[in-house]
Amino acid sequence: MNFDIVEMDELQLLKDELSKRNAEIAKLKMTLQEKEKQLSLRTDITKEALKPLDKVNKLSNESISRYSRQLILPELGVTGQVKLTNSSVLIVGAGGLGCPSAVYLAAAGIGRLGIVDYDEVELSNLHRQILHTEDRVGMSKSQSIATSCHRLNSGVEYVPYHLALNSSNALPIISQYDIVLDATDNVATRYLLNDACVIAGKTLVSGSALRFEGQLTVYNYENGPCYRCLYPKPPPPQTVTNCSDGGVVGVG
């Protein structure tokens, strides 16, 4: 009889502990939903000027611990990490190139990360666009990337733009960032980004991937050559292939 009582007491303790843990999980889920809700409120900010980043002069103990493996690199060091924390990058295109670019910039500790894309997540994206998930099919790609990166590094400021860049909004958005990363597969957008970066005096890093090949080029660095310098006129539409038509392998 005493043995049965002990077992019942242990069972009750386990039930109480399980109930406690479930309550903690529910609280964490509510906190996560609230954070993601706050993040989603930033998707319509095309006319809103971003506040300047809060300048960091030294690294916190937490930052030193987080970034310790890259801090020991003489090419980066504490000075480089502080510069990174005080810098901003705008990624245009939240697909196969935008996803890995975003996750590594976030992990490295960039101060502000903007993500521009007009599209929503589709099932056909998931084999290569690694920050999107099955349960986010139908969500805006920019929001999906911001959500994933926020879970990786909440110390970075994420600014998702669910829109298509055009001649009206490109310059106001681009002007607020230090560097622009072109991760699109659209020739017209490449020329638009190039022209806006030249006007705004921003460096443009341009990447492309098709089938089994990839390219990476830096334009307008310290007033160097731009994309239009190399290709003054856009190619005929029938000569251009994108990922939807030509395919792309899902391995970086």
Language-model features: locations:
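Adenine nucleotide-associated cytosolic modules
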Residues: 2-252
